[in-house]
């Protein structure tokens, strides 16, 4: 895939408008100006905006920087996360994005990747800024490019955030932790209704 000696910025998921992949492409075009040899963008998935994204890649002259895999099975997702260093989630400032939190950020963090989310509430509240990830101003490709550049050029920050993110997910959002919380809630309800 041509990733040797490159940092991999990667997105795994559905290619729909509200995910903001057009914003990610714009940010990568800006990043290319000063760091073109330093990164590749891996886009894993498929969806309604796939052809639009391919046209945008050509328009922004990102053909040498972007790799599309198409849809992959859920069993292959972890293999692709193993290739990724930085996991941006550029969701747009739409109501559905403000309210609904996907599992993607937890998967990326559990894999020890640097999570960079847009400032939509459902994502921003997951991140402890600078510790477990970074947040950029929603719908702002310039700010996303700045955050990408920050972690692209700072190896220590990248390692620290990835390690902290992994630890935080294991301590707060593993299936064992979640099942204990749910069990505790049920136990409390049962106790109150005796």
Segment roles from a protein language model:
Residues 99, 120-130, 134-135:
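Short acidic/histidine- and often glycine-rich active-site loop of Leloir-type glycosyltransferases
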Residues 12-16, 31, 47, 72:
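Short donor-sugar binding/catalytic loops of nucleotide-sugar-dependent glycosyltransferases
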Residues 2-28, 42, 182:
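Conserved donor-binding/catalytic core segment of Leloir-type glycosyltransferases
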Residues 89-98:
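Short Ser/Thr-rich beta->loop micro-motif in glycosyltransferases that lines
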Residues 143, 150, 157-171, 181-184, ...:
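A short, well-ordered alpha-helix in the C-terminal region of glycosyltransferases
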Residues 86-89, 107-117, 127:
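Short hydrophobic beta-strand element within catalytic cores of glycosyltransferases
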Residues 129-130, 134-141, 150-156:
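Conserved acidic donor-binding segment of nucleotide-sugar-dependent glycosyltransferases
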Residues 44, 51-78:
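Nucleotide-activated donor-binding/catalytic signature segment of Leloir-type glycosyltransferases, i.e.
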